[in-house]
Protein backbone atom coordinates (compact mmCIF):
# COMPACT_ATOMS: atom_id res chain seq x y z
CA UNK A 1 0.00 0.00 0.00
CA UNK A 2 1.24 3.48 -0.89
CA UNK A 3 -0.25 6.72 0.40
CA UNK A 4 -0.03 9.91 -1.65
CA UNK A 5 -1.37 13.42 -1.04
CA UNK A 6 -2.62 13.94 -4.61
CA UNK A 7 -3.68 17.58 -4.40
CA UNK A 8 -0.18 18.92 -3.66
CA UNK A 9 1.24 21.13 -6.42
CA UNK A 10 4.16 19.36 -8.17
CA UNK A 11 7.11 20.89 -9.96
CA UNK A 12 6.78 21.44 -13.72
CA UNK A 13 8.34 18.08 -14.62
CA UNK A 14 6.09 16.13 -12.27
CA UNK A 15 2.72 17.43 -13.36
CA UNK A 16 0.26 18.36 -16.07
CA UNK A 17 -2.68 20.74 -16.03
CA UNK A 18 -6.10 19.17 -15.50
CA UNK A 19 -9.52 20.34 -14.37
CA UNK A 20 -10.07 20.63 -10.62
CA UNK A 21 -13.38 22.19 -9.56
CA UNK A 22 -13.70 24.00 -12.88
CA UNK A 23 -10.18 25.46 -12.87
CA UNK A 24 -7.02 24.21 -14.53
CA UNK A 25 -4.65 23.02 -11.82
CA UNK A 26 -1.13 21.68 -12.10
CA UNK A 27 -1.60 18.09 -10.95
CA UNK A 28 0.94 15.41 -10.15
CA UNK A 29 1.40 12.56 -12.62
CA UNK A 30 2.96 10.21 -10.06
CA UNK A 31 -0.24 8.32 -9.22
CA UNK A 32 -1.22 7.86 -12.86
CA UNK A 33 2.25 6.60 -13.76
CA UNK A 34 2.29 4.17 -10.82
CA UNK A 35 -1.12 2.84 -11.86
CA UNK A 36 0.03 2.41 -15.47
CA UNK A 37 3.07 0.39 -14.36
CA UNK A 38 1.50 -1.69 -11.63
CA UNK A 39 -2.19 -2.03 -12.56
CA UNK A 40 -2.85 -1.43 -8.85
CA UNK A 41 -6.32 -0.48 -7.64
CA UNK A 42 -6.65 3.07 -6.36
CA UNK A 43 -8.62 4.11 -3.31
CA UNK A 44 -9.12 7.53 -1.77
CA UNK A 45 -9.19 8.01 1.95
CA UNK A 46 -10.03 11.03 4.04
CA UNK A 47 -10.98 11.88 7.59
CA UNK A 48 -13.89 14.07 8.69
CA UNK A 49 -13.96 15.75 12.08
CA UNK A 50 -17.18 14.87 13.89
CA UNK A 51 -19.16 17.56 15.74
CA UNK A 52 -18.88 18.25 19.46
CA UNK A 53 -15.42 16.69 19.78
CA UNK A 54 -16.93 13.38 18.72
CA UNK A 55 -13.73 12.19 17.13
CA UNK A 56 -13.18 11.41 13.48
CA UNK A 57 -14.72 9.31 10.73
CA UNK A 58 -12.42 7.62 8.21
CA UNK A 59 -13.87 7.12 4.74
CA UNK A 60 -12.24 5.03 2.03
CA UNK A 61 -13.73 4.83 -1.45
CA UNK A 62 -12.68 3.71 -4.89
CA UNK A 63 -11.13 6.28 -7.17
CA UNK A 64 -12.89 7.53 -10.28
CA UNK A 65 -12.57 4.88 -12.98
CA UNK A 66 -10.91 7.26 -15.45
CA UNK A 67 -7.77 7.14 -13.29
CA UNK A 68 -7.07 3.79 -15.01
CA UNK A 69 -7.17 5.29 -18.52
CA UNK A 70 -4.02 4.79 -20.61
CA UNK A 71 -4.06 8.46 -21.62
CA UNK A 72 -2.06 10.39 -19.01
CA UNK A 73 -4.23 13.54 -19.14
CA UNK A 74 -7.43 11.50 -18.75
CA UNK A 75 -5.92 9.57 -15.86
CA UNK A 76 -4.77 12.74 -14.09
CA UNK A 77 -8.23 14.26 -14.58
CA UNK A 78 -9.60 11.10 -12.94
CA UNK A 79 -7.30 11.70 -9.99
CA UNK A 80 -8.64 15.23 -9.60
CA UNK A 81 -12.22 13.97 -9.94
CA UNK A 82 -11.49 11.47 -7.18
CA UNK A 83 -10.29 14.26 -4.90
CA UNK A 84 -13.34 16.36 -5.81
CA UNK A 85 -15.63 13.46 -4.85
CA UNK A 86 -13.96 13.30 -1.43
CA UNK A 87 -14.09 17.06 -0.92
CA UNK A 88 -17.79 17.19 -1.79
CA UNK A 89 -18.56 14.85 1.10
CA UNK A 90 -17.31 17.48 3.60
CA UNK A 91 -16.69 20.72 1.67
CA UNK A 92 -16.30 22.79 4.82
CA UNK A 93 -13.43 20.61 6.03
CA UNK A 94 -11.25 20.69 2.92
CA UNK A 95 -8.00 22.63 3.30
CA UNK A 96 -9.10 25.53 1.07
CA UNK A 97 -6.30 27.76 2.37
CA UNK A 98 -3.80 25.58 0.48
CA UNK A 99 -3.07 27.49 -2.72
CA UNK A 100 -3.94 24.69 -5.13
CA UNK A 101 -4.15 27.02 -8.16
CA UNK A 102 -0.96 29.01 -7.59
CA UNK A 103 0.71 27.64 -10.75
CA UNK A 104 -1.21 28.65 -13.87
CA UNK A 105 -0.80 27.80 -17.56
CA UNK A 106 -0.32 31.47 -18.43
CA UNK A 107 2.04 31.97 -15.45
CA UNK A 108 -0.20 34.77 -14.12
CA UNK A 109 -0.74 35.02 -10.38
CA UNK A 110 -4.03 33.47 -9.26
CA UNK A 111 -3.80 34.70 -5.66
Regions found by a protein language model. Name each.
Residues 1-111:
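Non-catalytic C-terminal accessory region of glycerolipid acyltransferases
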Amino acid sequence: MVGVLPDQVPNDEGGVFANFFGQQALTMTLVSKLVARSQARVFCGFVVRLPKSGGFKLTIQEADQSIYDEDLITSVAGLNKSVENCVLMAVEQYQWEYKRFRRQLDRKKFY
